């Protein structure tokens, strides 16, 4: 699977992801880019789950952003509705972590859109490890959002067999 982590702190929101792609018990690729910018670079997003499924969802989410003039929450809710009700989309297996200058959200295939209380998102197989590391760093250091994401991904990469230490990181400043 993968690890995606997002942290919001001091006017910065960052999403980072590892690069490992596995097929069964074989590592197929180590430098996949699972985080990208959307909607005129105003939204950042990362995915955990099937790569082809995630690219389909990125495309659909970007269309929703265009339709709703970049309103992140509205676009996320509309994507989640479609994902839950459309027969073809229901078969897609992925999670999205998305953020803009105002909100950080998790979008699931069950039709859930979750905004975490503490603006910390960690999804994928290494998510619990990255979340624990990020929470400890948020509560006990003055590190910036990018440093916390980098360190959390590194820790998850050391622990989770489906996560590696290759990192793709995107950041928005607001």
UniProtKB/Swiss-Prot annotation:
Chain residues that bind Na(+): 157, 160, 163
Q: Where is the active site?
A: 2
Q: Where in the cell is it found?
A: Cytoplasm
- Activity regulation, free text: Allosterically activated by HslU binding.
What keywords would UniProt list here? Allosteric enzyme, Cytoplasm, Hydrolase, Metal-binding, Protease, Sodium, Threonine protease
Q: What is its main location?
A: cytoplasm
One Pfam family it belongs to: Proteasome
Catalytic activity reads:
ATP-dependent cleavage of peptide bonds with broad specificity
Gene Ontology terms describing biological process: proteolysis involved in protein catabolic process
Q: What is its EC number?
A: 3.4.25.2
Example GO CC term: the record gives: proteasome core complex
Q: Which family does it belong to?
A: Belongs to the peptidase T1B family. HslV subfamily.
Name this protein carries in UniProt: ATP-dependent protease subunit HslV
Q: Name the species this protein comes from.
A: Yersinia pestis
